[in-house]
Amino acid sequence: MCSCLVVKNTVIGSGRTKIAVPLVARDAAELSAVLEQIKNMPFDIAEFRADFLECAGSIGEILHHTQTVRDALPDKPLLFTFRRHGEGGSFPCSDDYYFKLLDALIESRLPDIIDIELFSGETAVRRAVANAQKNGIAALLCNHEFHRTPPQEEIVCRLKQMEDCGADICKIAVMPQSAEDVLTLLSATLKAKELAAKPIVTMSMGQTGAVSRLAGQVFGSSITFGSGTQNSAPGQIGVSALRATLDCLENGAD
């Protein structure tokens, strides 16, 4: 039975699927514009995608921009994500830099949730998870497959591996090559929901997989990602359209 996670009065893992909006910007001016544009959008969680910054190689600059986001959205749960190139992100970096950055963000206590890539070395991942939780930050462990959809059993196994590493939220995103692949992801989500003790987040990417972003409440995915001003992953739906569709599915259409 999945237990929920409460972050700034937002309940993750129970009730309606929560909408996260990625904040994508190259510099301070773009970030300011993005924050202005999304402030009245119907989202639940802000995800700061720091890997898109031109200054992504500077921990100090990233901390500065994260503070800007925190100040602009004081009441929204803030998910900090630094997606590396190998998992579909914009910045290639070493494990050493990656974990130094995560440590700095954790110790700043600016984010409420921090994204940690599962396949970054088990010892380092477990240490980062423990450090986050010690500082009152929820650890979201994640994995991304940009070229295929693994079998159902493998998807469930990876989500279980995240939970075994201490994750507060377990996330996997896969790329479908067919409609059957989308069904595989949804079936895996349903199975993982039955087994998991922590909230799970799943999605099938691209246009073919877009339906998975709308079906979380039925199959068990706790968060869906919708674009605010710019997509951060293939197949994201605009936040306003996403909210309207989720409302329609939840309340029923006449």
Swiss-Prot record:
| InterPro entries hit by this protein | Aldolase_TIM (IPR013785), DHquinase_I (IPR001381), Type-I_3-dehydroquinase (IPR050146)
The protein's GO terms of the molecular function aspect are: 3-dehydroquinate dehydratase activity
In its keyword annotation, does this UniProt entry include Acyltransferase?
no
The domain of life is Bacteria
Q: What is the E.C. number?
A: 4.2.1.10
- Which positions are annotated as binding 3-dehydroquinate? E47, F48, R49, R83, R213, S232, Q236
Q: Which Pfam families does the entry mention?
A: DHquinase_I (PF01487)
Keyword annotations for this protein, in alphabetical order, are:
Amino-acid biosynthesis, Aromatic amino acid biosynthesis, Lyase, Schiff base
- EC main class here is lyase
Which pathway does this chain act in?
Answer: Metabolic intermediate biosynthesis; chorismate biosynthesis; chorismate from D-erythrose 4-phosphate and phosphoenolpyruvate: step 3/7
Catalyzed reaction equations: 3-dehydroquinate = 3-dehydroshikimate + H2O
**Role:** Involved in the third step of the chorismate pathway, which leads to the biosynthesis of aromatic amino acids. Catalyzes the cis-dehydration of 3-dehydroquinate (DHQ) and introduces the first double bond of the aromatic ring to yield 3-dehydroshikimate.
This protein's assembly is summarised as:
Homodimer.
Per its UniProt record, what HAMAP family does this chain match?
Answer: AroD
Protein name per UniProt:
3-dehydroquinate dehydratase
